[in-house]
Amino acid sequence: MTRRVFARGMMLAAASLTTSSLLSACSTAADAATEQASLPATGANDGGAEGTEPLTATEFLFDTVITLTIYGTQEALDAAIERCRFFENTFSRTVEGSDVWRINEAAGQPVEVARETADIITQALAYCEASEGLFDITIGSVSSLWDFKEGVRPADEAIAEAITHIDYRGVSVEGTTVQLSDPQAKIDLGGIAKGYIADDLKQLLAEQGVESACLNLGGNVAVLGTKPDGSPWNVGIQDPNGSAQDVIAAVPCTNGSVVTSGLYERQFTEEGVLYYHILDPRTGYPVVTDVVSSSLLTDSSTDGDAYATMLFLMGRDEALALVNEDDRFEGLVVDNAGEITLSAQAPFELF
């Protein structure tokens, strides 16, 4: 693998996706490569009265394993976990009774939703507009057909019909009321949800008096402040060609986020064809790309979530051009030849 830097003019493109579950972890030691192999154990451990020892909780939420590590009180950690459960039961497309489920089942009728649901949809629509629909949260009509757990490939006819219902312009938000103009359209917030949740959790913990925390939502890592000794958190980047414990790089992060998306996260093979979980809203099929993994360092996990998978549709060169032109991001891209490419100012350390 080689390190290369690109600096080209910006090209705007985007993609939509189902929820990703890449493993990327915070390190409380200087060597992220070593710590990546030993994530905190399930449950919460006892912390010091003054928050001098870390409190950690690990649960299966958002279709992945999440680990929250804070230097604070047990009450703050419990509040963060409860907040995660709230989002699981509000944003999930598949949880019966969730806001998104009710919107999709309403056949075009207006639906009253939580403030957070209206907010995330409003933010998501801004990405849809900026990308002229290449990022489109109404990809749910297609993503609901694919089953990457059981390895189910939809019929071509079903995909062709489903993509006719992809159009973000048919989504309206008025206060906390959401309506789809197409009765057969379906929303899928997988391309932005974990980023939004990570940013929300940081705000919640800060309000609880927590000044140091690392939130690993499985591919979306957000950190609050620095480590207790004042040094940055180190976030490891998984090797897309290795095991979940193998890392290719680490990046220091203070009060920001590192978001990684990879083709290998969910896939299956049928009749010799490999299908990836990242779907192209223009075709309804998995994206065709030379990018295997992309990682973004950014202040906003919401931005990082939306853009990390956008890079797949763009391809390596155009993706790095976009990152170099957008001062919100620094990035790392691994292509299908195994080469690692960094943005011009990327502080990633390669291993």
Predicted regions and their residues:
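Mature catalytic core of soluble alpha/beta enzymes
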Residues: 1-351
